[in-house]
Amino acid sequence: GVTIGKDLKNSGSLQSTGDIKAENTVNTGKVISEKNISTKDLDNSGEITANKQITSSNIDNKTTGKLSAGDTITANGNVANQGSVRTNGSFNISGNFTNYNEILTGGDLTSKDILNSGTLKVSEKITGRGIFTNTGEILTSNLDIDTAGNIINTNKIVVLENSKLKGNNINNAGYISSTNLELRTPTLTNSGRVEVDNKISANNTNFNNVTGGYIGSNQKLELNNSNILNLGILESTS
């Protein structure tokens, strides 16, 4: 392996059949490991590829940056992505996450704040424990957002299985589809389209489906103890 006991600035090609370890790293070239890559803060506008894991503190992946891991990517700080991130495993973020471009993960994605204006495809589950704002496109199997802040969607969220959205306010002006959708919030405002195959539950909520809003379930719409303002379409087949 390669161990660099200080900061790394790479504009060439660094390759190893073992682990690559460095302090703060600025990469404009290529870093390739057949095993693991670990750094402190990572500033990448080149290519970084690990056959196994990438571990870092803060990650700033620039427009031309490509990050690729055969297993997991772990960030012990914040992540900002303007480039491309691909991992066959999970993407674990201790801090906040901002995505402007493209992320593909084969496992889970966990973070505090999630701000997505790009394309976010997560094979298993997205878990957010901070504010959630989506102005891009999200595709995942499961979505679990639990925040004291707000949940905002103005574009597209497709969840193949279950969605749980808990927040101070939930505002949907875009498109949400899921098999089951559980909403836990004092106030829901929908001017977009919500389509659910099975059950929508939104109990103890000020439920505002405003003009142009559509909320439909192929099975059950459960709105117990909720104040309902409907100026759009509410639909349930059972």
Say what each PLM segment does.
Residues 1-238:
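Extended beta-solenoid/beta-helix repeat architectures
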